[in-house]
Curated annotation (Swiss-Prot):
It comes from Bacillus subtilis (strain 168). It comes from the Bacteria. Keywords: Signal. Belongs to the universal stress protein A family. InterPro entries: Rossmann-like_a/b/a_fold (IPR014729), Universal_stress_UspA (IPR006015), UspA (IPR006016). Residues 1-18 form the signal peptide. This is Universal stress protein YxiE.
Length: 148
């Protein structure tokens, strides 16, 4: 039924549950599994007094490198966890807006199922901000499993 799966992880407890579910399904379905982590770009806001903030380029590069280093560590741990259960997985690191990157990689890979963790936000906050899982479920062209 599902021959290619993509699970998105961010190091949270919910994404760990999503990974467990994806590994279980991939093993059961004998499906290919891709594990995706999206590192967000650092956001710099301006000062309300001057309207200008100077951030040295090397500092921004250091932040990007640390974000990527942490993301690669999360991916490596996830790959090891999958291997322990007998599932070989590929890992993908991307930068950008998580929902957008998840959908792009799902389309690129031709996946038949996307697995994401629920962020657990609800009510007004979700209505105002939205959640990655909600955006992915609304915009995906393939089934999405949201794990709680």
């Amino acid at each position: 039924m599902f021959n290619k799966m993509l699970v998105a992880i961010d190091g949270s407890d919910m994404s760990a549950k999503a990974l467990d579910a994806a590994v279980h399904l991939a093993k059961e379905q004998q499906a290919e599994l891709s594990i995706l982590h999206v590192g967000r770009e650092a956001v710099v806001t301006t000062s309300s007094l001057t309207g200008i903030v100077y951030v040295p380029e090397h500092f921004i590069d250091e932040i990007r490198n640390e974000v990527k280093k942490e993301g690669l560590k999360i991916l490596e741990n996830a790959k090891e966890k999958a291997a322990e259960k007998g599932v070989q997985a590929e890992t993908i690191y991307a930068n950008g807006e998580p929902a957008h990157e998840i959908l792009n990689h799902a389309k690129e890979k031709g996946v038949s199922l996307i697995v994401v963790g629920s962020r657990g936000i609800s009510g007004l906050k979700e209505m105002m901000l939205g959640s990655v899982s909600h955006k992915v479920s609304q915009l995906s062209t393939c089934p999405v499993l949201i794990v709680r």
